Regions:
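Alpha-helical tetratricopeptide repeat
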Residues: 1-190
């Protein structure tokens, strides 16, 4: 039975989020082999940008369906692309394409985005090593258009922006990066 004091103790969450989480836990506990529940929860996590939790649930979907639920592969590829994990994104896309029937335009588009993002990320790294700061900043921006949640690429763009004299861009990136670091010490070491 859910008691009101539990809701009052939750400072960082409102009551509806707590109720949603409890309902999800109860649903999954009551039917742990229902892959649809895991898929729905994974898509909810994805919409909340909780990528590790979403990936975990998509993995569970694939485990329960013997990797036959191809949409889970596509969703994993999208998450990996947003995080800048190019190899994992390509692997998930290959799994999706090998399991899906027919040609999927959204998978083809994601494939080209992953290819473009990976190439831009590589170009940004080369430009940074060559101290071509503006080229690095532009290439990192292109990579971030695909990998919008990549801390590594955003840090790289911030460093290149600082070196190029674009303080405003660097501050924007560092403002995004800082909340994603676990400790202040890690942020200061950047």
């Amino acid at each position: 039975m859910l008691q009101v004091p539990i809701l009052k103790q939750s400072v960082s969450m409102n009551a509806s989020v707590v109720i949603w989480r409890l309902a999800n836990i109860l649903c999954v506990e009551q039917s742990p082999t229902d892959y649809v529940l895991y898929y729905k929860r994974a898509t909810a996590y994805l919409s909340l940008n909780k990528h590790p939790s979403a990936l975990q649930d998509f993995e569970k979907v694939l485990e329960l369906t013997s990797s036959s639920f191809d949409k889970a592969h596509l969703m994993k590829a999208r998450i990996h692309a947003k995080d800048g994990n190019w190899t994992e994104a390509k692997e998930s896309l290959e799994s999706y394409k090998s399991n899906s029937k027919g040609d999927d335009p959204s998978a083809n588009e994601l494939t080209s985005q992953v290819t473009e993002g990976a190439a831009a990320h590589k170009k940004a790294s080369k430009a940074a090593r060559a101290k071509l700061w503006t080229a690095c900043e532009e290439a990192a921006s292109t990579a971030l258009s695909v990998a919008s949640h990549s801390i590594e690429i955003r840090q790289q763009r911030a460093e290149c922006s600082l070196a190029a004299g674009d303080i405003e861009m660097a501050v924007g990136d560092l403002t995004y990066v800082r909340p994603h670091h676990r400790t202040r010490a890690a942020f200061l070491l950047m």
